[in-house]
């Protein structure tokens, strides 16, 4: 069963280096050939897949017209990895946010969005300082070092989160509360020589709760399109806007509860990842047997590889640092089709979500790249 290949599609991590290069920052070039700019912004619409946009083009005519080509987000196709790609210009094998949850040796399994233990909910900021988990220079720090103002325009609720600290250090944070001030603050930043990252989360939320393509999701997509139109209409001369996403989404129709599957628990000491993309951490010497068991039980419902094979296949990017390697499961399982690997007791909330993402399918991997110029 062949894993889909996207090598000829630009990576999400290339977008910000390309924008910084357009702003004249030395050494920055994402290979996207953007024109010289006075100010630039990347607007990330959480959960907006390329295929979803194509399927619902009538709900988003502005985005559809601007989005002439897709990006690939890399593995796993999840928010922590996508936000880190924006914040570093790198793939997960280098920035280290290898999942919604992943093991950090000596500290158990970290929930990267909440920065808490995925096992007992304890706060891990003290044990795992954000800038130690992700120590690489951020794109915002690189912009600021070149004398360009760097700003983040996002929900005020995210202003002091650990993930923000790990991936957006060096930026001035402009906390907003709704679509109106998201557009207004973005245009305010773009009025001077600056780089801006703006973020909208609610499309992803409604996709999880009601399903991607549901009526609620489509109504939100219409609001997103109006947001983009409002920013595009107000772009000052010399400004460039790039609208992207961190992942697509699928509706999960078949679930397997790992907690009720003894053959999938044998030799396993911990789980990371999420419903569509699992890190499986094994007992010493058990990896080969775990791979065999998971392949036997899951069959064509998932791609199952031992860590080194997943790395060699490029799942986590062209290179994986020694710092990041132990965070990747001894075994990695990526769901195909509309299948999900749930943990009904340990992850009750996640189990009951309608829409899911994380895997390697084109519905999850491909996102729009929409470019507008003032």
Features from the language model and the residues they span:
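Feature captures the catalytic ectodomains and active-site-proximal regions of enzymes
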Residues: 1-374
């Amino acid at each position: 069963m062949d894993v889909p290949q996207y090598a000829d599609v630009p990576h999400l991590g290339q977008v910000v280096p390309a924008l910084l290069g357009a702003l004249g920052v030395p050494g920055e070039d994402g290979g996207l050939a953007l024109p010289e700019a006075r100010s630039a912004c990347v607007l990330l619409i959480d959960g907006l897949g390329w295929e979803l946009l194509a399927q619902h083009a009538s709900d988003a005519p502005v985005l559809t017209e601007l989005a002439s080509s897709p990006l690939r987000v890399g593995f796993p196709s999840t928010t922590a990895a996508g936000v880190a790609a924006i914040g570093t210009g790198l793939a997960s094998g280098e920035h280290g946010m290898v999942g919604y949850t992943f093991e950090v040796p000596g500290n158990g399994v970290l929930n990267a969005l909440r920065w808490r233990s995925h096992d007992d909910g304890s706060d891990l900021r003290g044990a795992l300082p954000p800038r130690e988990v992700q120590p690489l220079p951020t794109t915002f720090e690189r912009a600021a070092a070149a004398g360009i103002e760097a700003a983040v325009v996002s929900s005020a609720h995210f202003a002091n989160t650990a993930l923000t600290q790990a991936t957006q250090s060096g930026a001035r944070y402009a906390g907003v509360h709704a679509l109106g001030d998201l557009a207004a603050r973005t245009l305010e930043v773009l009025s001077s020589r600056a780089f801006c990252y703006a973020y909208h989360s609610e499309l992803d939320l409604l996709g999880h709760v009601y399903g991607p393509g549901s009526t609620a999701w489509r109504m939100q997509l219409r609001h997103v399109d109006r947001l983009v139109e409002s920013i595009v209409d107000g772009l000052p001369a010399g400004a460039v806007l790039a609208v992207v996403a961190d992942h697509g989404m699928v509706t999960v129709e078949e679930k397997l509860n790992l907690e009720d599957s003894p053959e999938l628990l044998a030799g396993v000491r911990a789980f990371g990842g999420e419903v569509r993309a699992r890190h499986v951490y094994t007992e010493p010497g058990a990896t080969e047997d775990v791979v065999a068991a998971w392949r036997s039980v899951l069959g064509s419902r998932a791609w199952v590889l031992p860590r080194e094979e997943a790395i060699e296949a490029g799942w986590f990017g062209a290179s994986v640092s020694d710092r990041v390697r132990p965070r990747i499961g001894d075994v990695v399982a990526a769901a195909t089709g509309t299948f999900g690997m749930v943990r009904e007791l340990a992850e009750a909330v996640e189990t009951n979500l309608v829409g899911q993402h994380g895997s390697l399918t084109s519905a999850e991997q491909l996102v729009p790249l929409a470019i507008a110029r003032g």
